[in-house]
Amino acid sequence: GFTSPAPRDYVGSKPLVAPEAIAIYNFTRLHNFRLILAYHTQGKEIYWQFQNYATQEAEQIGEIFAQVSGYALSEVPYNSSFAGYKDWFLQEYRRPGYTIEAGLGENPLPISQFNDIYNDNIGILVLGAVL
């Protein structure tokens, strides 16, 4: 899935080609977000850094998110960087941004994980609105 459209891992032929990427880009430009959360599934991890653009505050907030969710606060694997919403937001705005890898297992995750994912992430969603 790295070189052609697929259910996962394909980042596109260039930035801002996919309609959903354009929509998120435009929506972000219209708002003055203090922080952003980008949700993916697979891993029970929180990625917070991108090429040293993240601030110390971003790590501190990430630690709070990790504590309330039980997810690990992690560095993004190098081969997974450079194409995500969080990466762009950190570079463009120098504000906290996070990719939340919800759930555990291989995509697509089973619907049976829904309640666990919800319970793990409700604290992140509430705190993300007020921190």
Q: What is the role of each PLM region?
A:
Residues G1-T55, E63, T99-L109:
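Active-site/substrate-binding loop(s) of hydrolase catalytic cores
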Residues I64-P77:
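Short, flexible loop segments at boundaries between secondary-structure elements
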Residues R29-F33, G70, V126-V130:
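Sec-exported extracytoplasmic/periplasmic mature domains
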Residues G43-K44, Y71, S81-D87, L104-N107:
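Short Gly/Pro-enriched loop/turn and capping motifs at secondary-structure junctions
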Residues L109-L131:
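His/Asp/Glu-rich mid-to-C-terminal helical/loop segments that flank catalytic regions of hydrolases
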Residues P19, A23-N26, Q56-I64, S80, ...:
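Extracytoplasmic/secreted proteins, especially bacterial periplasmic and envelope-associated proteins
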